[in-house]
Amino acid sequence: MPFALGQRWISDTESELGLGTVVQVEGRMVTVLFPATGENRMFSRAEAPLTRVTYNPGDTVESHEGWSLTIEDLTEKDGLVIYHGIHSETGEQVTLRETLLNHNIRFNKPQDRLFAGQIDRLDRFGVRYQCQMLRHKLATSDLLGLQGPRVGLIPHQMWIAHEVGRRYAPRVLLADEVGLGKTIEAGLIIHQQLLTGRAERVLVIVPDTLRHQWLVEMLRRFNLRFSVFDEDRCVEAYADHDNPFYTEQLVICSLELLRKKKRLDQALDADWDLLVVDEAHHLEWTEEAPSRAYQVVEALSEVVPGVLLLTATPDQLGHESHFARLRLLDPDRFYDYDAFLAEENSYKDVAIAAEALAGNAKLPDAAINSLTELLSEKDIAPSIRLIQADGIDSDVQQAARSELLQELLDRHGTGRVLYRNSRASVKGFPKRFFNPHPQTMPEQYLTAARVSSMMGGHKTLEAKAAQALSPEKLYQEFEDNSASWWKFDPRVDWLIAFLKSHRSKKVLIIASQAETALSLEEALRTREGIQATVFHEGMSIIERDKAGAYFAQEEGGAQALICSEIGSEGRNFQFASHLVLFDLPLNPDLLEQRIGRLDRIGQKNDIQIHLPYLEDTAQERLMQWYHQGLNAFELTCPSGHVLYAEFAEDLLNVLVGDDADELTNLLNHTQSRYKELKHAMEQGRDKLLEINSHGGDRAKAIVERLAQNDENTQLIGSVIRLWDIIGVDQEDKGENSIILRPSEHMMFPTYPGLPEDGVTVTFDRDTALSRDDIALITQEHPLVQTGLDLITGSETGTTSVAVLKNKALPAGTLFLELIYMADASAPKSSQLYRYLPPTPIRILLDKNGNDLSAKVDYASFDKQLSAVNRHIGGKLVTASQPILHPLFAKGEEYAQAAVDELVIQAREKMTTQLTGELDRLESLKAVNPNIREEELEYLRNQMQELNTYLDASQLQLDAIRMVLVSHV
């Protein structure tokens, strides 16, 4: 290369150094000073990775003194270029030697880099374009936020997340029956809200025992890094902020922490966007005396825009506590308990009409009359005629049914705030089989009971019943050695024999008391050496996690896990199918929660429920009430809570006494009332609620689209190429997985989210679901998103020169491919991306300035191109400059016209969608007070903001590829 002192060059490998000046040429070496950083670099003259910087007529350059020059001509003297042109400030004719150019110039615009000879590899241009296309596709997907989580594609879960996650500040009660996946639904909604920018700060309140489980679940399933806050963490955070809750965006804490006034005040002041409360059925409320826990959540719900309440046990027919939870979501709507009860009485007519619409038969007259009355403000006659007509296309009829059903759901009841799926409406559950195992009452227990009754003392009926149900506890009160009961209790003998005969099976054992669980573990270990682990409230969260993992381990793990009652809240063990109830809880909801640890979606086997009980005792009588009265062992019993409240006193008397006639009467009355409630629930609100909650065919359609996206091999190829270009080390591991590791030759110094020791990933959902240690890669995964950001946020692939070998075209024919980005700067929360996301615009110009992009698609054109090296590419660009300058101007004209059209389309789409939604909600507000004014105001403001942002839309040249035809 010919070098001369004072010439300006730029480093091909360190463009951030700015414009360099040749300060020494000696022998075979050249030294370049980069004044912007004050650094020197010495290069071999023959192989220096440097590009000579020269400008052309029409360019504007800046002097080191700060004034600019518009170049009209240039001359060369002693190897240095002298620019002649117009001074930007004085308008005079001036000259500027290249030595005096501003050294802070960086060539980050694609055309500047192209003319400076900073030309990228051909494959990098392709990857950059693919990255921009992937980002655009993701931003425009109405399934954004549903594809990425590592969860099964279960229709009702995806439907609820799709419906709720798209709302501004959703306020809903997720009340699916046990085992239907409320935590996953909440995680999907959180993931959607964060990914779409509708929320940035999230507070999750959970029972103390579930904090770590939520932390792991959010990270493992949703790639969301929450922080667990307790008192110690709050104290530590003071070093960073006066309010500890401001130190993290995503926080999990317990209600216990927020019972403290200081912590609650800080949480109230922390500007959360979304509040999530798990196990919300523990929030007790009466109008006269709401609990402290309820007051804490109520205070937060008044200042946080979005609220999700998760509860496994909402009352079915208008219980006060259920009303109280709805009141948290919308106190204006649910202001009076009596008014709420009165409204529920009208659900029957709505349910009948909804059930008729959900079927396939013609509508009976009663249903038509109900619909006409319920939707009186709307002309439904055309839809009714379509449904009732013969010979009409079934899809058209189904669309008419769906439209009326949606109108019904929108206008009546709690359809927008309450989602409740039952097992009756969701397929895929195993059967439950009840196996009672009667045992003889030990003499020791009979003696302890006699002594206790002789000693007298005043006890409540409930305390007496609890004592009768746990004779081992009563016995321990009279024994110094609390563990001795298990040496004679026949239930323990049965349990040991059962475990020995089922050695290959995992068995979950649940007892009411932690002391009982510990004693059982000791009995199994000391008497037979059976591997079992314990799970109780006295253990730390980490100890509980270890116990759960030890039980889950296939090789060398525990055969049995023995839980106290807390083991039946929040922990799931679908890999086991045998459940031993060592005793029975006095609450039907607790019994269902126990069984629900195994009876969940994902359970592959039928569930065997075993109950060793002592004959002719309170245990047997309670078992009979559950089994014969409620059928609670083999079926879920949604009315259990109501039935227990009605029959509690009679049941307690039966448990404490020994009157066979009383028991028979209780069972008969319970069975009769159970049937009444079951019939009432089928006739009432539940049908309508379930139709709305499981989504029907619409939910199936969402799942089908997600499954198709999972099979997208084009995406897999694009992501693999992305990692190849960045330089990520990829090692195949088995049929469906890859190990990713950082490499020494990566294009970027770090790859956020990629651990130093690597990570195992898969594109196959089933593989990821079966292996906790393998990440599921989709477009939404942080490793993909980060990779896209690394490429599109850098200069990678912004310039390229290629050769087209085609003898049908004259040699030397030039094409200029320009990739523009149409964009508008706006906060993510504005939702502008739904209408005008960053959109790639491809322009392919021939030498005459004609745009050929509509005739020549990217993929077929790209396949015909061959790469050229950087230096040859630089020479080709220099030789083609006179042609290129007018082509850039022409390309911008075409791109601007495309942007203008995109903005028109975006504005029309936005106006149509938001005006339609606003009109719908305003008309609904007249008949359904469940529509919040905040939602309407948000839509009005959003339309104004979006119009402003669209007015400021911009066009930016993102990448250039110059192509020359060659016959060689």
Swiss-Prot record:
It is an enzyme of class 3 (hydrolase). Its EC number is 3.6.4.-. PROSITE patterns: HELICASE_ATP_BIND_1, HELICASE_CTER. It holds the Pfam family Tudor_1_RapA. Residues 491-643 form the Helicase C-terminal domain. GO terms for biological process: regulation of DNA-templated transcription. The keyword Manganese does not apply. Keywords: Activator, ATP-binding, DNA-binding, Helicase, Hydrolase, Nucleotide-binding, Transcription, Transcription regulation. A motif (DEAH box) lies at residues 278-281. Interacts with the RNAP. Has a higher affinity for the core RNAP than for the holoenzyme. Its ATPase activity is stimulated by binding to RNAP. NCBIfam families: PRK04914.1. This is RNA polymerase-associated protein RapA. The lineage of its organism: Bacteria, Pseudomonadati, Pseudomonadota, Gammaproteobacteria, Alteromonadales.
